[in-house]
From Swiss-Prot:
GO cellular component, one term: nucleolus
Name of the protein in its database record: Neurofibromin
Subcellular location: Nucleus; Nucleus, Nucleolus
Molecular-function GO terms, alphabetical: GTPase activator activity
Keyword Nucleus in annotation: yes
Nucleus found in the keyword field: yes
Keywords: GTPase activation, Nucleus
Function, in words: Stimulates the GTPase activity of Ras. NF1 shows greater affinity for Ras GAP, but lower specific activity. May be a regulator of Ras activity.
GO biological process: negative regulation of fibroblast proliferation
């Protein structure tokens, strides 16, 4: 990534403003710091030169890693993607006909909705981070992927990949909800998606589930959904078509939203 930024800084065919060049120089410095190596899973590196001349195939492990390592990779991917997006948008301001972001988004969407245990989770996260618009249908597709991940998680034995896929869909939904049309019924339904993830009682998914719940409440509050109705009234109303499924989840974790909404809301957790 640092080499790509360096190429942009030195390319004579691209003419950037001083402001853009400053963004590129600062980004190049930041990407050369040890903290950014860690985001790529690279540790114990003393300088940029060390990693530049290290063989990309040396010390590569093909054994399955722990889920903690994969969780780190997905959350790190958010940071890296947002940093690259900032660089791309700075460059695009000086290139009016530039289609870089459109092409990136198109590729991310293609792999996000295509089954591939290695690429799909990462593509979902990237798609969520870089998208500038989202449709009701795309959100439904992501929820279907989440549903398939849940089914695989319950059936096993590939619990590891299933949890990674679940986390990726939740991260994508968290990023995309603010882009949804304000009249979309998905806004309220995503509350129960977040609660379902939390009710799984998987410590590795708790952070992602909590982030989706927080984003959901902030978004609904900004849309003034709670001006005339309490959160309990809003969410229990949208729950009715899903009552049979929701009750099964509630029974599994020993909660009851019908009898005590507030207590049940704070109940799920690791």
């Amino acid at each position: 990534r640092a080499r790509v930024i360096h190429s942009l800084c030195t390319c004579s065919q691209l003419h950037f403003s001083e402001e853009t060049k400053q963004v590129l120089r600062l980004s190049l410095t930041e990407f050369s710091l040890p903290k950014f190596y860690l985001l790529f899973g690279i540790s114990k590196v003393k300088s940029a030169a060390v990693i530049a001349f290290r063989s990309s195939y040396r010390d590569r492990s093909f054994s399955p890693g722990s889920y903690e390592r994969e969780t780190f990779a997905l959350t790190s991917l958010e940071t890296v993607t947002e940093a690259l997006l900032e660089i791309m948008e700075a460059c695009m301001r000086d290139i009016p006909t530039c289609k870089w972001l459109d092409q990136w988004t198109e590729l991310a969407q293609k792999f996000a909705f295509q089954y591939n245990p290695s690429l799909q989770p990462r593509a979902l996260v990237v798609f969520g981070c870089i998208s500038k618009r989202v449709s009701h249908g795309q959100i439904k597709q992501i929820i279907r992927i989440l549903s398939k991940g849940l089914e695989s998680c319950l059936k096993g034995p590939d619990n590891y990949n299933s949890q990674v896929l679940i986390e990726a869909t939740v991260i994508a939904l968290t990023k995309l909800q603010p882009l949804l049309n304000k009249d979309s019924p998905m806004h309220k339904a995503l509350f129960w998606v977040a609660m379902a993830v939390l009710e799984l009682d998987e410590v590795n998914l708790y952070s992602a589930g909590t982030a989706l719940l927080e984003q959901n409440l902030h978004t609904l509050d900004s849309l003034r959904v709670f001006n005339d109705k309490s959160p309990e009234e809003v969410f229990m109303e949208i729950r009715r078509p899903l009552e049979w499924h929701c009750k099964q989840m509630d029974h599994f974790v020993g909660l009851n939203f019908n009898s005590n909404f507030n207590f049940a809301l704070v109940g799920p957790g690791p």
